[in-house]
């Protein structure tokens, strides 16, 4: 299936994809990375969640946990560092949301003994110091590919600036609707590293109208991408620190709303999972729930198959981005 996707991506002007994690099938993944690069000129950013989505929750204060995760990451780097298609490594995703207990809270004796107001910063110090250890080790075995810190918004990056200086790029996950707001200059003021938007986007389902809305998705993605250009090193009037971004996402994920029930994976669920008022086309939906995890693709998926693979259905956003990227590459 990656050959089908790779061809469509190449035709649209995609130059890099993000893989959130490695695979146990090393040869299969190497072939996919190689095919994307050799056939379509598309590079790969390969990541590791650093145990964030494991069960039980991650335990970044535990030496055994840290050693196991570090070993996994370094094995990944050793395995894939010589693949021509590799562009860089991404460490973590939105792990900083665990510091306050918002997502996947973890036990930390040092933090638990401290004042409540200091606990999150102590966890941040422990986590970012751990990421820095890994980044240093990666640079020793692979000096050719940058290391990216994956972080939810700007949260705790003032702590990262002190304890994680060896990362090369700050990767931001952000969902703020039409504009990224202060993200570019905000990063400059607290952690002056190049910025990469490692996850952003807009879904294509209008929860208020209860219908697919390609116009809505295309509107937000166009505005977002224009801000990326404005704040790149090539522009004159922006922050000049943005390297680019990874749109979330290429194709819809039908399994995501109820991932524990495999029978539901064949159903394209339209129930929104969370709320973000900045996506204002449908923020008046019931309970303001307007973010639909199964509808973020710029390419839809059909139940019909062609050569054993579900047909890809490009949305308006796909063609809008194709036109925008073609215009940019010609300048």
Where are these regions (language model features)?
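Active-site clefts of carbohydrate-active enzymes
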Residues: 52-58, 100-101, 110-113, 191-232, ...
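Aromatic-rich peripheral "rim/lid" segments of glycoside hydrolase catalytic domains that contact
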Residues: 241, 248-331
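Active-site mouth of glycoside hydrolases
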Residues: 1-174, 179-180, 188-190
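A structural motif corresponding to the C-terminal end of an alpha-helix
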Residues: 11-13, 79-85, 130-145, 227-242, ...
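Short, conserved catalytic or adaptor-binding loops enriched in Gly and charged residues
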Residues: 163, 238, 290
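Amphipathic alpha-helical segments in well-structured domains
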Residues: 30, 66-73, 131, 184, ...
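Long, contiguous hydrophobic alpha-helical segments, chiefly transmembrane helices and signal peptides
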Residues: 9, 14-20, 44-49, 147-151, ...
């Amino acid at each position: 299936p990656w050959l089908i996707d790779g061809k469509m991506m190449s035709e649209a002007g995609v130059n890099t994809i993000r893989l959130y994690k490695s695979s146990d099938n090393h040869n299969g993944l190497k072939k996919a990375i190689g095919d994307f690069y050799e056939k379509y000129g598309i590079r790969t950013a390969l990541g590791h969640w650093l145990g964030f989505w494991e069960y039980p929750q991650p335990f970044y204060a535990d030496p055994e946990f840290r050693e196991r995760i570090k070993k996994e990451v370094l094995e990944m780097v050793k395995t894939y560092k010589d693949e021509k298609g590799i562009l860089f490594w991404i460490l973590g995703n939105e792990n900083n949301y665990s510091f306050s207990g918002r997502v996947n809270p973890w036990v930390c004796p040092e933090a638990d003994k401290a004042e409540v107001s200091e606990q999150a910063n102590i966890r941040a110090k422990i986590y970012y110091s751990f990421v820095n250890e890994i980044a240093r080790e990666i640079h020793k075995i692979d000096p050719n590919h940058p290391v990216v810190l994956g972080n939810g918004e700007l949260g705790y990056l003032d702590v990262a600036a002190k304890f994680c200086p060896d990362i090369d790029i700050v990767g931001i996950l952000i969902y703020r609707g039409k504009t990224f707001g202060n993200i570019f200059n905000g990063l400059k003021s607290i952690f002056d590293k190049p910025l990469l938007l490692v996850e952003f986007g807009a879904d294509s389902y209008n929860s208020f109208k209860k219908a697919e809305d390609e116009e809505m998705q295309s509107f937000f993605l166009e505005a977002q991408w224009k801000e990326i250009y404005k704040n790149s090193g090539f522009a004159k009037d922006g922050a000049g620190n943005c390297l680019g971004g990874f749109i979330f996402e290429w194709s819809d994920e039908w399994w995501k709303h109820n991932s524990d029930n495999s029978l539901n994976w064949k159903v394209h669920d339209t129930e929104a999972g969370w709320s973000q008022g900045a996506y204002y086309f449908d923020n008046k939906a019931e309970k303001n729930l307007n973010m639909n995890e199964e509808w973020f693709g710029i390419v839809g998926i059909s139940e019909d198959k062609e050569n054993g693979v579900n047909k890809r259905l490009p949305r308006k956003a796909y063609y809008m981005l194709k036109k925008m990227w073609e215009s940019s590459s010609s300048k």
